């Protein structure tokens, strides 16, 4: 199963992005796929970016941002995932990874999102930041752009 990072969603939405066309085309190309999962954690981050004037020239209102997020949450073919029923083992693995001397504090949220998706069957992750997600446990991490 494939899941999508926030940066791909943002590029697909933001017409001012140099990567807009490629991201939009890729998102469009997987619309009929049924082996796609969208993470509530990724959507929460996407919501924040949609409202941020440092990210978008014309940030969205709260209502507009939720409307965009809801289009992904209500996708007729894609699976919506949040925390797995039993999240203790996932968080045990997260804190174990966080003890590594080379673990950057800013990686905590991405690692939690990745472990949550993996625990629910996601094997492939599409992101612009491939190196940030390599070695987390996905079988494949790639940039579709």
Where are the regions that the model predicts?
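Short, well-structured N-terminal submotif of metal-dependent ribonuclease cores
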Residues: 1-38, 50-67, 131, 135
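Histidine- and aromatic-rich ligand-binding microenvironments
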Residues: 5, 106-107, 129, 145
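Active-site neighborhoods of divalent-metal-dependent phosphate/nucleic-acid chemistry enzymes
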Residues: 33, 77-128
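Aromatic- and histidine-enriched alpha-helix N-cap/loop-to-helix transition segments
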Residues: 38-44, 108
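Active-site-proximal, substrate-binding regions of enzyme catalytic domains
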Residues: 50-86, 91-94
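Short, hinge-like loop/turn segments at secondary-structure boundaries
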Residues: 53-57, 99, 143-145
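Short, basic/aromatic-enriched C-terminal tail that caps enzymatic domains
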Residues: 134-145
């Amino acid at each position: 199963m494939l899941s999508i990072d926030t940066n791909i969603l943002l590029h697909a939405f933001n017409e001012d992005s140099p990567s807009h066309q490629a991201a939009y085309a890729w998102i469009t190309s997987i619309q009929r796929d049924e082996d796609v999962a969208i993470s509530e954690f990724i959507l929460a981050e996407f919501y924040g970016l949609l409202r941020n004037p440092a990210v978008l020239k014309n940030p969205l209102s709260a209502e507009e941002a939720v409307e965009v997020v809801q289009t992904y949450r209500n996708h007729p073919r894609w699976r919506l995932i949040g925390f797995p029923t039993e999240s203790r083992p996932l968080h045990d693995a997260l804190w174990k990874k966080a003890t590594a001397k080379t673990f950057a504090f800013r990686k905590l949220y991405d690692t939690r999102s990745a472990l949550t998706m993996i625990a629910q069957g996601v094997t492939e992750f599409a992101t612009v930041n491939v190196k940030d997600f390599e070695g987390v446990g996905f079988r494949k991490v790639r940039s579709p752009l």
